[in-house]
């Protein structure tokens, strides 16, 4: 296993390995940089790979506010000090932060890879509203351990994903505080950068898995105004990089090599 260097900067915990062009990895809600280990292992042979714990996650600062622009501004402060621009890979919440980052600091973002991301979080349909409300209900009524059980079943279904599901549940309970997680969750509705996507000149690879929460047609609609985008539709669920690290790494390598 390739050794990671763990450090703190501007209140953020960073896990890094390798030398070369900068590849920045941003995790999803309730996750941490630990979930990018397979990508750190694979890409640190040719890249300087940095996985960040976003505010409110992992070993990073736990104080609010927790809105997406603030999470992105945290990362921007660190990225602005780096000598080179980065390819930024974001999963779910991390994809939202990646978009904000590219808008806040465009000269330091070379390209984006958005895995099951959103350009807005408006909860427009009954299904979207129900899903968001259900997560808050599980959190309020039952607490973090039962929520981890429910999320594990949703993210990693089936007997073949039992080991991944088990690891997810353990990490979720260990690294998340109920009050902070709830504040992060409640900060999401109403966020949107959809009207500003036309200003992003960088290449953007959109990965939308076959069994994600958001239907492909709606994701295409959300990102239609991007001037330089490609879309990829592999088989998988919402947290695909953890579900199928080899498959994700193969696609990410192909995207990076293309540009």
Question: What spans do the regions from the language model cover?
Answer:
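Conserved loop-alpha-helix segment in the C-terminal half of the alpha/beta-hydrolase fold
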Residues: 203-236, 242
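Active-site signature of alpha/beta-hydrolase-fold catalytic machinery across serine-
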Residues: 38, 100-104
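Flexible "cap/lid" loop of the alpha/beta hydrolase fold
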Residues: 103, 110-141
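Conserved HGGG/HGGXW glycine-rich cap/lid loop of the alpha/beta-hydrolase fold
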Residues: 12-61
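Active-site loop/oxyanion-hole signature of alpha/beta-hydrolase fold enzymes
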Residues: 38-41, 50-89, 250
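Conserved alpha/beta-hydrolase catalytic His-Asp/Glu region
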Residues: 123-127, 142-198
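Gly/Ala-rich beta-loop-alpha elbow adjacent to hydrolase catalytic centers
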Residues: 90-94, 98
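Alpha/beta-hydrolase fold catalytic core
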Residues: 1-23, 45-48, 83, 110, ...
């Amino acid at each position: 296993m390739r050794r990671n260097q763990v450090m703190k900067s501007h209140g953020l915990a960073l896990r890094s390995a390798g030398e070369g062009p900068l590849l920045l990895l941003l995790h999803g809600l309730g996750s941490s940089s630990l979930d990018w280990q397979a990508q750190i292992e694979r890409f640190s042979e040719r890249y300087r790979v940095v996985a960040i714990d976003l505010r409110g996650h992992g070993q990073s600062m736990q104080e609010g506010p927790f809105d997406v622009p603030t999470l992105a501004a945290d990362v921007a402060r660190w990225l602005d000090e780096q000598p080179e621009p980065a390819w930024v890979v974001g999963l779910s919440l991390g994809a939202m932060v990646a978009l904000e980052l590219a808008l806040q600091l465009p000269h330091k973002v070379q390209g984006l890879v958005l895995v099951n991301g959103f350009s807005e979080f408006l909860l427009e349909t009954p299904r979207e509203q129900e899903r968001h409300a259900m997560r808050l209900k599980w959190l309020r009524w039952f607490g973090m351990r039962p929520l981890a059980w429910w999320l594990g079943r949703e993210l990693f279904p089936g007997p073949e994903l039992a080991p991944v599901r088990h690891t997810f549940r353990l990490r979720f309970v260990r690294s998340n505080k109920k009050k902070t997680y709830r504040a992060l969750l409640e900060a999401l509705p109403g966020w949107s950068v959809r009207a500003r996507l036309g200003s992003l000149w960088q290449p953007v690879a959109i990965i939308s898995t076959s069994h994600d929460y958001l239907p492909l047609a709606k994701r295409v609609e959300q990102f239609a105004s991007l001037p330089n985008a490609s879309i990829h539709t592999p088989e998988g669920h919402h947290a695909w990089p953890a579900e199928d690290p080899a498959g994700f790494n193969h696609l990410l390598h192909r995207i990076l090599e293309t540009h």
